[in-house]
């Protein structure tokens, strides 16, 4: 770790978090806009739209381990720069797909390749940034590093989605695609001059061994992620079924509460311990989801969404502190990558599984199941992490 003062460390962490925000805008900008392009301009089916969206998630999930090994062997800074290259390349392929627009399936296939590159870039940037930040600040500030990165990523997703829609409405796909190309270049300028760590050569650690080290906090991440995935996938459908207004405000209030708690409580995991904060957070998340399930009106459901955001906010940094505490520094990047994949699993499989259940139990009961998972997660995290 470099010899940095507290002040210079904060400035450096702010710079790499700002770069993370710019990099994650490349993910937020196409988030809502791209499905509309595939539907309205390419006139393709919902199945192909779903593949276009899901291909990025699959690429991220499958490359978490590779990104972690890259961070452990080449350093966090180089891993981030590699991820930026992939993200910029995805924007170039979005532009190329415009040329193939007269042949919709060809244009779609080019977009899929771009989405895969974007998923790889996301994996490398997130894992590299966390590894790099912890090397700069020290493992005792792991919670703060993860919290600042989380604010950057969720802020970019919250801003990027409406920004992408606005740009698409004004100029079609070209302007959002061009911005996706330029943003990683701007982010590279933000991190220019920050020292990077060059790890010493280490033997490669089997992924299964790493899984054995991180499955306890990973289990908590899965049970927490079910709640967020349920809220993001089914709130609009449930509000529509109830004929409630202000559907979009659920995610807005969730995001505001999420970022506010991250901002004001970023040091809680380092101060009070990851296991304690994670257990309390899951209890709050479960309460919020239960409020949504029992809500008699849209207003009550929106309050539940905000409470859920408060509960979800510190889960990633608090469990991340536990991961850092349980693994040796030389495999920290791999461990963070493998552990993050647990969240990808929750986000990827909750929607399809819940979608199979909704014809039988309805949208409302899905929130009850999600609340039960969060409360179960509180008990599991308390037992597994406290006893280990």
Curated annotation (Swiss-Prot):
UniProt GO cellular component terms: plasma membrane
Subcellular location: Cell inner membrane
TM regions (residue ranges): 18-38, 42-62, 89-111, 116-136, 145-165, 171-191, 219-239, 248-268, 287-307, 341-361, 365-385
Pfam family membership, one: MFS_1
Transmembrane recorded as keyword: yes
Swiss-Prot/TrEMBL keywords: Cell inner membrane, Cell membrane, Membrane, Transmembrane, Transmembrane helix, Transport
Keyword Membrane: yes
Membrane topology per record: Multi-pass membrane protein
Primary location recorded for the protein, binned into one broad class: membrane
Record's protein name: Uncharacterized MFS-type transporter STM4428
SUPFAM superfamilies: MFS general substrate transporter
Matching PROSITE patterns: MFS
Listed GO MF terms: transmembrane transporter activity
InterPro entries: MFS, MFS_dom, MFS_trans_sf, MFS_Transporters, MFS_YfcJ
NCBIfam families (alphabetical): PRK05122.1, PRK12382.1
Family: Belongs to the major facilitator superfamily. YfcJ family.
């Amino acid at each position: 770790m470099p010899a940095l003062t507290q002040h210079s460390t904060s400035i450096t962490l702010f710079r790499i978090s700002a770069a993370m925000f710019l990099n994650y805008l490349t993910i937020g900008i196409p988030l809502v806009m791209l499905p509309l392009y595939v539907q309205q301009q390419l006139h393709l089916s919902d199945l192909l739209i779903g593949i276009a969206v899901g291909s990025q998630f699959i690429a991220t999930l499958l490359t978490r381990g590779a990104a972690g090994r890259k961070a452990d062997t080449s350093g966090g800074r180089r891993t981030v720069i590699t991820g930026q290259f992939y993200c910029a390349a995805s924007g170039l392929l979005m532009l190329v797909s415009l040329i193939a627009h007269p042949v919709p399936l060809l244009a779609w296939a080019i977009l899929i390749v771009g989405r895969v590159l974007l998923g790889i870039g996301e994996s490398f940037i997130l894992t590299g940034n966390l590894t790099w930040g912890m090397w700069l600040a020290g493992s005792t500030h792991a919670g703060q590093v993860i919290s600042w990165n989380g604010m950057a990523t969720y802020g970019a997703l919250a801003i990027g989605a409406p920004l992408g829609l606005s740009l698409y409405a004004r100029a079609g796909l070209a302007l959002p695609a061009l911005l996706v190309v330029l943003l990683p270049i701007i982010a590279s300028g933000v991190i220019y001059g920050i020292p990077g760590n060059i790890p010493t050569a280490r033997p490669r650690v089997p992924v299964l061994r790493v899984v054995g080290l991180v499955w306890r906090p990973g289990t908590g991440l899965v049970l927490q992620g079910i709640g967020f995935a349920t809220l993001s996938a089914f709130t609009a459908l449930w509000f529509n079924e109830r004929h409630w207004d202000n559907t979009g405000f659920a995610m807005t209030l969730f995001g505001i509460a999420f970022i506010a708690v991250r901002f004001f409580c970023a040091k809680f995991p380092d101060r009070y311990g990851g296991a304690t904060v994670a257990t309390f957070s899951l209890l709050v998340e479960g309460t919020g989801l239960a409020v949504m399930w029992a809500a008699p009106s849209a207003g009550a459901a929106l309050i539940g969404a905000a409470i859920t955001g408060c509960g979800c906010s510190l889960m990633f940094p608090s469990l991340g502190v536990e991961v850092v505490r349980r693994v040796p520094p030389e495999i920290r990047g791999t461990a963070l990558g493998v552990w993050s994949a647990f969240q990808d699993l929750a986000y990827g499989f909750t929607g399809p599984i819940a979608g199979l259940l909704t014809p039988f139990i309805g949208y409302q009961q899905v929130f009850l199941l999600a609340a039960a998972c969060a409360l179960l997660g509180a008990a599991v995290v308390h037992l597994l992490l406290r006893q280990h």
